[in-house]
Design a protein with these regions (language model features):
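Immediate post-signal peptide segment of exported/extracytoplasmic ligand-binding proteins
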Residues: 2, 6-9, 13-57, 70, ...
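Extracytoplasmic small-molecule ligand-binding "clamshell" domains
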Residues: 30-101
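Ligand-binding cleft/hinge of the Venus flytrap
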Residues: 49-53, 65-73, 150-169, 173-174
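Short helix-initiation/N-cap motifs at beta->coil->alpha
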Residues: 62, 78-89, 130, 164-180
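Loop/turn elements at helix/coil->beta-strand transitions in domains of secreted/extracellular proteins
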Residues: 73-76, 94-95, 140-141, 161-162, ...
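Acidic, polar ligand-binding/catalytic clefts
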Residues: 75-137
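Short, hydrophobic beta-strand segments that form beta-sheet elements in well-ordered domains
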Residues: 126, 141-146
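Short, polar loop motifs at secondary-structure junctions
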Residues: 130-131, 147-153
Length: 181
C-alpha cells in the first residue's frame, strides 16, 4: 500500500498544466477539410489519458482533441506513445500532442502550446509505513519518476537523492511497491 505525501513534493515549480502542443501548425493547417490529424499522447494519466477497454487511447484529452477535429471537419487519430518522445515526434511522426504536460521554457523553444486548461501539482508517493514527510527526508533515497516529466526534473533538483527514471510511470510505482525505490 502507498500514501501520497504532499509535503515531500514541495518544489520551485508550483503549477503544471496539461497543454496541447502543436509545433507542426503550418503543416497541420495545410491539411484540407476531411483530412486526418494525428496526435500523440501517453495514456497513463487517467482520467485525462488512459487505454480504454477497446485498447485505444481514451479520456478527457482524447475527447477534447477529437471534438476540435470535428469542429474543423477533420478526423483525429490518437497514438499512444512514450511520454518522453511526444515533443520530439511533433512535425515528423505526429501533428501535435495532447497530454498532461508542464509548459517549460525548454519545451517552448521546440513547440507551441495552447492555453493551459488544467493545473496540477506534483506528489511523491511513498510506502504506507514510510517516515518520509518532507523533501529533506528524501536525502540518500532513490526517487523513481517517468522519463521526461516534471517529476523527473524535480527529483533531479533535490540535493542528495538518486533519480531513477522509467519509460512508464507504472514501472516506477511497481519498483516502489517492490522496495527498489
Amino acid at each position: 500500500a502507498t500514501k501520497e505525501s504532499t509535503q515531500a513534493a514541495e518544489s520551485s515549480v508550483a503549477e503544471t498544466a496539461a497543454a496541447t502542443t502543436e509545433a507542426a501548425a503550418t503543416e497541420a493547417a495545410d491539411k484540407t477539410e476531411g483530412g486526418v490529424l494525428v496526435f500523440g499522447t501517453n495514456a497513463e494519466f487517467p482520467p485525462f489519458e488512459y487505454v480504454g477497454d477497446d485498447g485505444e487511447p481514451d479520456g478527457f484529452d482524447v475527447a477534447l482533441i477529437k471534438a476540435v477535429g470535428e469542429k474543423l471537419g477533420m478526423e483525429v487519430q490518437v497514438e499512444n506513445m512514450e511520454f518522453d518522445s511526444l515533443v520530439s515526434s511533433i512535425g515528423n511522426r505526429i501533428d501535435g500532442a495532447i497530454a498532461g504536460m508542464t509548459v517549460t521554457d525548454e519545451r517552448k523553444e521546440q513547440v507551441d502550446f495552447s492555453d493551459p486548461y488544467y493545473e496540477a501539482v506534483q506528489f511523491v508517493i511513498v510506502p504506507a509505513d514510510s517516515n518520509i514527510a518532507t523533501a529533506d527526508d528524501l536525502k540518500n533515497k532513490t526517487i523513481g519518476s517517468q522519463l521526461g516529466t516534471t517529476g523527473m526534473f524535480l527529483s533531479e533538483d533535490i540535493e542528495g537523492v538518486t533519480a531513477q527514471t522509467y519509460n512508464r510511470a507504472i514501472d516506477a510505482v511497481n519498483d516502489l511497491v517492490n522496495g527498489r525505490v
